[in-house]
Amino acid sequence: MKKIENKTFGGERPLFGAHDICMEGITITDGESGIKCCSNIECHNSKFYGKYPWWHVDGSVITNCYFAPESRSAIWYSDNMVMKDCTIDGPKFFREMNNLELENVSINDADETFWKVDGLKLKNVKLHDGTYPFMFSKNIYVDGLESDSKYVFQYCHNVEVHHAHITTKDSFWECENVTVFDSELNGEYLAWHSKNIKLVRCHISGEQPLCYMDNVVLEDCTFDPECDRAFEDCSNIDAHIKGAITNIKNPISGRIEADGIGSITYTEFAKASAGACEIIDKSK
């Protein structure tokens, strides 16, 4: 690989069409499309300030780099990328990509980040602020995620999450084939309108979780007292709850078991009669 060290690039497309290069200590200043239509590139200990600095790149490794707020929409249409030990302060990163892997990365404005990514692996990643991370992405594996960004994981398919701490309402909406292990899911309206959802040893908080769903499985999950009106219009439920749940409302079918159930509500709008879903209060 050709080495480029300790240089500054500005203007339009200064490294357009570069292949087989290793960059160390470079700076991309004001301008656009600093690295574009490239392949087989490494970049280490560098800083990015210009807009759209990394588009249409196939095969890249980025480590110990900083992306400033001005570097918005920085990495799009780039496949087969590994990023480690980086800090990102710009919005709208990582769009329409295949095979993207991040480890020890902090994203401090996660607005519209990870859109339409197929094949995403995250390890020890932090997301802050912004809306709709992960929209329309699929084939996702996460181990270690802290996020207070709004509306994460919407319209996603084939997702596996471990050791996450997620704080937002409307997470995991319109999703299919999702499994979450050993995580904290904080926020109202968890996983509405989703199907084939499995939660294992998770703690759930927020109003009206898990509604309008088909095929939802819970294993040894716990609920905060604020979790009322759970499982409304849910079918094919298989829920084993540790501790108590405050309220269950209008479930359609399946089985719900908890150590304690505050109340069960069936209204005139219920889509199934009482008893169609088996509900077991182990305290009685």
Task: Provide a role label for each language-model segment.
Residues 1-284:
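Long, distal/terminal scaffolding or interaction modules
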